[in-house]
Amino acid sequence: MSDSEEEIKQNTDPVDNAWSLKIPAFRQEDNPHGMVEESSFATLFPKYREKYLREVWPLVEQCVAEHQLKAELDLVEGSMVVKTTRKTWDPYIIIKSRDMIKLMARSVPFEQAKRVLQDDIGCDIIKIGNLVHKKEKFVKRRQRLIGPNGATLKSIELLTDCYVLVQGNTVSALGPYKGLQQVRDIVLETMNNVHPIYNIKALMIKRELMKDPKLANEDWSRFLPKFKNKNISKRKQPKSKKPKKEYTPFPPAQPESKIDKQLASGEYFLNQEQKQAKRNQERSAKQADAAKKQDERRNKDFVPPTEEAPSRKRQAEDSSKVDVKALKAKLVKANKKSKS
């Protein structure tokens, strides 16, 4: 059995942890004839990155030349281009180099961006601009992701082994593929108003649990922190709510018109003089009613208030109460007068 067959047999065995598998290296012997057609990718960069890119571009050309690629910098158009050559033997390196210039256009330094050319390193550009509608909320949640003095961002980098850069409406991440998955989950949940400290705590707990072989096949959910949403609706409730009418499949009855009301009361059949006489009668009745109410309002001040008559029970209580001391003093006084 040859070495290649043994490698294939080893790869087909069951794997407990898929993340532990190493990506097989692609060597030049695997593609000795090179590339038939030229492939190229271009990306634009902002004006403020022009000075930095001009300084590091010789290093970029030297880096891509190791993989038989060609890089061009167009300062007039503001674009970076990477191309394959006839000597390029790795078909996927052009995709990796495209990711590198994308990261450099998004303010990632060249020293970090060139790591994406490695086989076990990938990148992820997460768009967060359209996840929050209000600008104030977006800025607040983005700052929450960075943390005070960049502490939150640094802890995310240490736990995921990724380089993370928050720039404008995007978050650029660079590192191993498992770490990129964790970074994307943290960023998206942070923009959905879940504080990143919960996910950071969960990652720290998982890292400690992975060290214990006894807990390898157990559920870890009981160890992880549980987040409870405490958002309360801030909409002011009306003081008096109108009760909803019961639903009926039939449309409401048509309201009576003025002519219908006149027909019902018989006014429709009266002539002009009779209608005028009826209106005068109604007017005089209203005036008499208003005059009566006005007289009652004027005479209200002259009406004496009603006084409560003393009840018999209260009178009996007053008569039953006798002041003994006052009676004694009265008798002593009367005796003195009689002696004198």
From Swiss-Prot:
Biased composition (Basic residues): 228-244
Chief place of localization: nucleus
Coiled coil regions in record: 269-302
KH domain mapped to chain residues: 124-192
Database matches in SMART domains: KH
Biased composition annotated in UniProt, kind: Basic and acidic residues: 275-301, 309-324
Location of this chain's protein in the cell: Nucleus, Nucleolus
Pfam families: KH_KRR1_1st, KH_KRR1_2nd
Keyword annotations from UniProtKB, A to Z: Coiled coil, Developmental protein, Nucleus, Ribonucleoprotein, Ribosome biogenesis, RNA-binding, rRNA processing
Region Disordered, annotated ranges: 228-259, 271-324
InterPro entries: KH_dom, KH_dom_type_1_sf, KRR1-like_KH1, KRR1-like_KH1_euk, KRR1-like_KH2, KRR1-like_KH2_euk, rRNA_assembly_KRR1
UniProt KW Signal keyword: no
GO biological process: rRNA processing
GO-annotated cellular components: nucleolus; nucleoplasm; small-subunit processome
Record GO terms (molecular function): RNA binding
Family as reported in the entry's similarity comment: Belongs to the KRR1 family.
Stated role: Required for 40S ribosome biogenesis. Involved in nucleolar processing of pre-18S ribosomal RNA and ribosome assembly. Binds to RNA. Required for female germline development, cell viability during eye development and for survival of dividing cells and epithelial cells during early wing disk development.
SUBUNIT field: Monomer. Component of the ribosomal small subunit (SSU) processome.
Protein name, UniProt field: KRR1 small subunit processome component homolog
